[in-house]
């Protein structure tokens, strides 16, 4: 019975644990059955392998031998050992049969087992008689077979196939390099050549059936085709399922300790004997504690002292200490020590001149840097008594008991950390840096300038009642047109297909055809103006449209618009058909007029104007109209005819305004030396206020293509700033002053009166009170 039990146990263990050698042999041989197997089919190498395994021994065989020795007598030990060898051979045969297929249980053939036993005994005797060489050869062959099975075949790792050794870093660091990392040998891994354009990508998307499952490896830059298992895993994760297909998240739960009251206990183990007997260990501990109390080693705890519920706040204070009486005592600040200006014989540079004395007397007492005038005496005997001594002592006493004091914690801050980190100007090029040309010809203030859309011609208007046309590249005056008053503003039509210039002087707006450049363009402009047909019903308009004839027509005059009041500014719409004029007069409701040249119509967009209008401008893209008064900039929607936004400039008097080509940013210059930048998407208050100029700003301008803006001031300088507006709405505009351009001389306390940029080049023009126009490139 013991032998049968041992064999049965060996068969069960071999079913659970099989050697990889047998798995390999079974995969090659196919299904192994008792009826098909023949002992003669086994080769010598296989016999040597099995014999080597038998010689190595195992715990199971030792257990079998121990069981056989316990069951049988000592006299039959030889027979039992031979039976144990037969059991080993049977176990080996069982292993071969079980390795073929798990679900097929082998049947033991008695005849084949006897032949195998004989063969095993014969092989074993040969090993014993032949010596150690045959045993060693058998073991070597067994080791060769076992070495063919790699124990790491089933191990997986996320970084086995990664050839790039850069580590877990952002791969964007290598976007500007031709390589993407380094391999195990330290050599560069170059990026794959990607010369596909959008057409190739579209063809690949249409023709390649694996396009949808091809992804790019960020570590190597190569294209990887996802397998079906990986695609299935991605789909499952997108659907919120588990990655493992075989995982069942809804397995039935077995409530072992259910809410049902059971009759019998879960475990019916009887209680131990020690649960009924007092513990000896506790008895020893109690005895030690009693002995320690008797010896006085352990003393009882003292009762806690009961503290009163209400206590005296000043019970432990020293009444004689100053800090005890005045917890928040702050010493009075010491008086400032006298300087050189308070000396009876100060250095000459500390003595004020007559102009400085008058300026000091005109200032308020709170604004004066010194409360006295420095005086010089020949000797100390000549110094008179201080007349304001009692008054000064009285003010000191008032400061001591009336002015509150507080402690301020000083924080050591590096001043360089407070300065914003701005890029260097050389990294923001191109921008104008030097004065290249000076346009001379006017005899008075040049109040306004404008550049043609092609950038070849320049028009300027002056107080000498002339309008001059210049060639930009040579500074040559090509044409001079006389008008009937001081020119306040000029504006070249921004439409490149129309050659027309608007000039404002006194109460008139003159439309000129300069006849410069392409003759076909000039002729087409004249035909466009002359093709106007008067409507049958003529409505009353606030402006008279007059057609120029005779000598004026020969000089280029085409239309004259007579206004009821003086015109200060003219500006064109981006399409070139609408013209806006400003008539600053707070007593009248007609301060802004919009003219349509093609239909010769004029309309007043506002019933009443809130404040004195300074300047107006059209939005470059949208139907918005910007109106700047003294302190506010109002944005109107011309289609809905309503107020969209009201910008607060936080300055005393707005002088000029410019709109960014994108239309989302506005800059305003003021007479109180401020330049305010508005971000329409951010707030109605200025995003930044620049105070770089020392005197009033007269003009501001944006470049149509480059991120540049310029401001002209009465201090005779033009400051060029880099104003980058990003497409990302989360990133604020970058404003960096890059250059201060000087060249104009201050005349009658006036400096630069107007600035404008070249339409295509990073050049800026400026006109000043010195009757010159300067080009900076």
Swiss-Prot record:
Q: Which SMART domains match?
A: BOP1NT, WD40
Write out the coiled-coil annotation as residue ranges: none
What Pfam families does this protein's entry cite? Answer: BOP1NT (PF08145), WD40 (PF00400)
Q: Which residue ranges does the record annotate as region Disordered?
A: 1-140
Q: Where are the WD repeats?
A: 441-480, 482-522, 562-605, 608-646, 649-688, 692-731, 747-777
Name the Gene3D superfamilies on file. YVTN repeat-like/Quinoprotein amine dehydrogenase
Per the record, its GO cellular-component terms are: nucleoplasm; PeBoW complex; preribosome, large subunit precursor
Q: Where is the composition biased (Acidic residues)?
A: 34-47, 56-76, 84-94
Q: Where is the composition biased (Basic residues)?
A: 115-125
**Where does this protein have compositionally biased stretches of type Basic and acidic residues?**
22-33, 95-106, 126-140
**Can you say where in the cell this protein is located?**
Nucleus, Nucleolus; Nucleus, Nucleoplasm
BP terms from Gene Ontology = maturation of 5.8S rRNA from tricistronic rRNA transcript (SSU-rRNA, 5.8S rRNA, LSU-rRNA); maturation of LSU-rRNA from tricistronic rRNA transcript (SSU-rRNA, 5.8S rRNA, LSU-rRNA); regulation of cell cycle
Mind listing the GO molecular function terms for this protein? ribonucleoprotein complex binding
The answer on whether this UniProt entry bears the keyword Nucleus reads: yes
Read off the InterPro entries from this record. Answer: BOP1/Erb1, BOP1_N_dom, WD40/YVTN_repeat-like_dom_sf, WD40_repeat_CS, WD40_repeat_dom_sf, WD40_rpt
Q: Which family does it belong to?
A: Belongs to the WD repeat BOP1/ERB1 family.
State what protein this is by name.
Ribosome biogenesis protein bop1
Query: From which organism does this entry originate?
Result: Danio rerio (Zebrafish)
What lineage, starting at the top, does this entry show?
Answer: Eukaryota, Metazoa, Chordata, Craniata, Vertebrata
């Amino acid at each position: 019975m013991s032998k049968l039990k041992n064999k049965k146990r060996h068969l069960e263990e071999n079913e659970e644990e099989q050697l990889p050698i047998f798995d390999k042999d079974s995969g090659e041989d196919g299904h192994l059955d008792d009826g098909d197997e023949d002992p003669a089919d086994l080769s010598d190498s296989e016999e040597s392998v099995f014999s080597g395994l038998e010689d190595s021994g195992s715990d199971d065989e030792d257990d079998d031998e121990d069981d056989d020795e316990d069951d049988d007598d000592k006299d039959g030990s030889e027979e039992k050992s031979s039976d144990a060898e037969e059991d080993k051979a049977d176990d080996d045969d069982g292993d071969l049969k079980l390795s073929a297929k798990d679900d097929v249980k082998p049947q033991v053939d008695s005849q084949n087992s006897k032949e195998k036993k004989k063969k095993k005994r014969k092989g074993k005797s040969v090993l014993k008689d032949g010596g150690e060489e045959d045993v060693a050869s058998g073991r070597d062959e067994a080791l060769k077979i076992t070495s063919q099975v790699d124990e790491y075949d089933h191990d997986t790792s996320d970084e086995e196939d990664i050839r790039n050794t850069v580590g877990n870093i952002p791969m964007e660091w290598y976007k500007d390099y031709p390589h993407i990392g380094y391999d195990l040998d330290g050599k560069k891994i170059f990026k794959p050549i990607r010369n596909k354009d959008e057409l190739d990508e579209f063809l690949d998307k249409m023709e390649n059936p694996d396009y949808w499952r091809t992804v790019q490896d960020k570590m190597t830059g190569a294209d990887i085709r996802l397998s079906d298992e990986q695609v299935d895993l991605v789909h499952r994760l997108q659907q919120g399922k588990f990655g493992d297909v075989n995982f069942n998240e809804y397995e039935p739960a077995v409530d072992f300790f259910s809410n049902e009251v059971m009759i019998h206990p879960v475990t019916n183990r009887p209680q131990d004997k020690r649960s009924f007997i007092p513990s000896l260990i506790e008895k020893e501990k109690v005895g030690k504690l009693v002995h320690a109390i008797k010896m006085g080693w352990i003393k009882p705890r003292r009762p806690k002292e009961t503290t009163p519920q209400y206590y005296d706040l000043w019970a432990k204070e020293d009444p004689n200490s100053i800090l005890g009486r005045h917890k928040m005592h702050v010493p009075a600040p010491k008086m400032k020590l006298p300087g050189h200006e308070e000396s009876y014989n100060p250095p000459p540079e500390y003595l004020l001149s007559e102009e400085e004395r008058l300026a000091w007397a005109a200032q308020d007492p709170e604004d004066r840097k010194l409360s006295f005038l420095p005086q010089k005496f020949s000797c100390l005997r000549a110094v008179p008594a201080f007349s304001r001594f009692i008054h000064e002592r009285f003010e000191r006493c008032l400061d001591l008991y009336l002015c509150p004091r507080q402690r301020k914690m000083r924080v050591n801050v590096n001043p360089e950390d407070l300065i914003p980190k701005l890029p260097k100007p050389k990294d923001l090029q191109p921008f104008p840096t030097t004065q290249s040309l000076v346009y001379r010809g006017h005899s008075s203030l040049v109040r306004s300038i404008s550049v043609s859309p092609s950038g070849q011609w320049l028009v300027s208007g002056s107080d000498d009642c002339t309008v001059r046309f210049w060639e930009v590249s040579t500074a040559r005056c090509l044409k001079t047109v006389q008008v009937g008053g001081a020119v306040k503003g000029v504006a070249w039509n921004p439409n490149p297909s129309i050659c027309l210039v608007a000039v404002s002087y006194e109460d008139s707006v003159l439309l000129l055809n300069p006849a410069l450049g392409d003759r076909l363009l000039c002729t087409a402009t004249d035909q466009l103006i002359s093709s106007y047909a008067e409507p049958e019903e003529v409505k009353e308009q606030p402006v008279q449209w007059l057609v120029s004839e005779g000598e004026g027509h020969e000089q280029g005059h085409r239309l004259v618009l007579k206004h009821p009041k003086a015109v200060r500014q003219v500006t064109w719409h981006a399409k070139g058909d609408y013209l806006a004029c400003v008539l600053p007069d707070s007593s009248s409701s007609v301060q802004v007029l919009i003219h349509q040249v093609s239909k010769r119509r004029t309309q007043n967009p506002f019933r009443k104007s809130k404040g004195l209008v300074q300047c107006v401008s059209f939005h470059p893209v949208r139907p918005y109209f910007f109106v700047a008064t003294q302190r506010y900039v109002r944005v109107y929607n011309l289609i809905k005819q309503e107020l969209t936004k009201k910008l607060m400039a936080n300055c005393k008097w707005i002088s000029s305004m410019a709109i960014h080509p994108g239309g989302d940013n506005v800059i305003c210059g003021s007479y109180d030396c401020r330049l305010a930048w508005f971000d329409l998407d951010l707030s109605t208050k200025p995003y930044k206020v620049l105070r770089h100029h020392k005197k009033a700003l007269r003009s501001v301008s944006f470049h149509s293509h480059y991120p540049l803006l310029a401001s002209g001031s009465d201090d005779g300088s033009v400051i060029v700033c880099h104003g980058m507006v990003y497409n990302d709405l989360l990133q604020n505009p970058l404003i960096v002053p890059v250059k201060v351009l000087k060249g104009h001389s201050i005349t009658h306390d006036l400096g630069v009166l107007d600035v404008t940029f070249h339409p295509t080049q990073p050049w800026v023009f400026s006109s000043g009170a010195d009757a010159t126009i300067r080009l900076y490139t």
